[in-house]
């Protein structure tokens, strides 16, 4: 007799009799493996039935940690077999908390996929748990026979054999195409090294957890070693992309985005199929990321910045090489060298001079953040604009400029040639020598780093002793062709605190108001605010 429908929803797959998840467990909740063809509920955990064909992978009951999306994603209802749906992604039912079972092996839906890989726990595949010729065809048949049955079951954590990784610990030889269809089954074995630490392929299932072979379990303890543990809402995921649902960095480092990313370096963004982002937190922008070769921690929304080295380069940038963690939203000072330059920059290398404005390329090593650009603490983010690239390579030493002797070409144009000292020419000048010592005038040789402080057009340079204001100030954009940012002259060895006078845009020379004229030795400043030669 027909069992009453728990949900109004259609069964995930007509051919499976797996019961829908209990009402409370909207998404991926563990359900008893009721007569599921997979039958073997190898894991003590209930298995969520679903298109996975009875996700054998035992999931812990607490599905809660993950968002339980409803809809097709919910409870893995998608018909596509796990393999198909997100090949190699041991997908937890969407809501499922992967953590429950560290090695959760989701049997790839059998039937379609073909013989379940291993007699082993949770044959990934089909009904017959017996070792199928195809070991765990993640891809659903497509992938050639994975040498390893690699049923991913394994207890919670343990070294869940996750045979997928071949033997409990041994990396599976099989293609283990975790990487979705894109990643052809043939791809590198991409053994899912169990505890082995990152496997050859980026897509180590084993997150930091180490042993957790396919520590897909988001919450499992231990930062996921994997390049991409996805941490859902938890603070910064340790792993580059901890996929931890709510639980803290999930070891999963799979990017799991099949195809979209391309192979995604083997990171399977879990994006494949309707499943879409398996864990909401992962915004795998398929395609957009291009191949995100670097493991990037995907900080999604709540994630805040995921400090780990996720280089998420949006759009054209292509793989952001710099390993800087780019959290969504303003990460605040982005310590990483990575310049956060969006746009066609191409690979965003850590120090990229942003050639903007007449200055020409900014030779300066410090990356200019775009816009006021959460200032890279080290680098002053240079707003783009004419001034955008501060040619000077001058390193901004926080504190005394120290011996940055290079004269910093400072003036060009209306300012009049600030005598020899820093001929700062815009345009052609190209990178001006680094530090410009403020040697002239009362200041004496003290070369102070001028933090660029910008507010408003000129930015009001902070008056009064700035002291050493190493903090990078975003350089205002605008007409200030020259280095408009005011350099606060710090007191310090200089002794005289020049109140920083911003370079005025337009005629820097004549912007009298722009520079507060300090009295005392500073009084000698030229009208244009420049120090005397």
From Swiss-Prot:
The modification Omega-N-methylarginine is found at residue 396. GO terms for cellular component: nucleoplasm. Keywords: Methylation, Nucleus, Phosphoprotein. It is found in: Nucleus. Residues 1-12 have a biased composition (Basic and acidic residues). Its main location: nucleus. Residues 1-31, 67-164, 177-259, 299-350 are annotated as: Disordered. The keyword Translocase does not apply. The modification Asymmetric dimethylarginine is found at residue 368. Residues 299-309 have a biased composition (Polar residues). The modification Phosphoserine is found at residues 160, 432. Potential tumor suppressor. Belongs to the DERPC family. This is Decreased expression in renal and prostate cancer protein. It comes from Mus musculus (Mouse). The gene is Derpc.
């Amino acid at each position: 007799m027909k069992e009453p429908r728990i949900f109004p929803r259609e069964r995930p797959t007509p051919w499976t009799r797996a019961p829908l998840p209990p009402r409370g467990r909207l998404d991926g909740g563990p359900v008893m493996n009721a007569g599921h063809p997979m039958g073997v509920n190898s894991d003590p955990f209930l298995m969520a039935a679903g298109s996975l064909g009875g996700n054998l992978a035992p999931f812990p009951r607490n599905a809660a940690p993950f968002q339980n999306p409803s809809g097709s994603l919910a409870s893995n209802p998608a018909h596509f077999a796990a393999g198909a749906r997100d090949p190699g992604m041991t997908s937890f039912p969407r809501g499922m908390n992967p953590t429950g079972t560290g090695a959760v092996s989701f049997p790839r839906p059998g039937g379609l996929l073909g013989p379940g890989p291993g007699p082993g726990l949770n044959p990934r595949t089909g009904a017959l748990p017996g070792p199928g010729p195809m070991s765990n065809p993640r891809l659903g048949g497509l992938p050639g026979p994975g040498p390893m049955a690699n049923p991913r079951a394994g207890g919670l954590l343990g070294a869940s054999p996750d045979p997928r990784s071949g033997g409990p610990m041994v990396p599976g030889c099989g293609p283990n195409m975790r990487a979705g269809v894109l990643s052809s089954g043939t791809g590198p074995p991409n053994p899912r090294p169990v505890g082995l630490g990152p496997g050859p392929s980026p897509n180590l299932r084993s997150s930091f957890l180490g042993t957790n072979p396919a520590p897909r379990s988001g919450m499992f303890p231990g930062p996921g070693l994997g390049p991409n543990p996805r941490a859902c809402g938890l603070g910064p995921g340790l792993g580059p992309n901890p996929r931890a649902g709510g639980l803290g960095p999930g070891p999963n480092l799979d990017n799991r985005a099949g195809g979209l990313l391309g192979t995604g370096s083997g990171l399977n963004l879990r994006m494949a199929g309707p499943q879409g982002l398996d864990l909401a937190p992962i915004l795998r922008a398929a395609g957009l990321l291009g191949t995100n070769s670097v493991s990037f921690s995907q900080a999604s929304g709540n994630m805040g910045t995921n400090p780990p080295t996720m280089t998420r380069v949006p759009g054209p940038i292509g793989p952001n090489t710099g390993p800087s963690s780019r959290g969504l939203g303003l990460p605040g000072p982005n310590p990483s060298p990575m310049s956060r330059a969006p746009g066609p920059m191409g690979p965003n290398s850590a120090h990229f001079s942003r050639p903007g404005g007449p200055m020409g390329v900014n030779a300066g090593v410090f990356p200019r953040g775009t816009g006021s650009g959460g200032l890279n603490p080290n680098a002053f983010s240079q707003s783009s604009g004419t001034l955008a690239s501060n040619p000077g390579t001058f390193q901004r030493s926080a504190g005394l400029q120290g011996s940055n002797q290079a004269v910093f070409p400072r003036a060009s144009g209306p300012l009049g040639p600030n005598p020899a000292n820093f001929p700062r020419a815009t345009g052609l000048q190209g990178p001006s020598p680094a530090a410009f010592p403020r040697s002239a005038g009362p200041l004496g040789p003290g070369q102070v780093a001028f933090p660029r402080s910008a507010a408003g057009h000129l930015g009001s340079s902070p008056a009064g002793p700035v002291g050493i204001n190493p903090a990078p100030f975003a350089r205002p954009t605008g007409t200030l062709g020259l280095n408009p940012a005011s350099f606060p002259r710090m007191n310090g060895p200089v002794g005289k605190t020049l109140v920083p006078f911003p370079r005025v845009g337009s005629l820097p020379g004549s912007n009298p108001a722009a520079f507060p004229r300090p009295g005392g030795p500073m009084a000698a400043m030229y009208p244009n605010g420049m120090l005397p030669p």
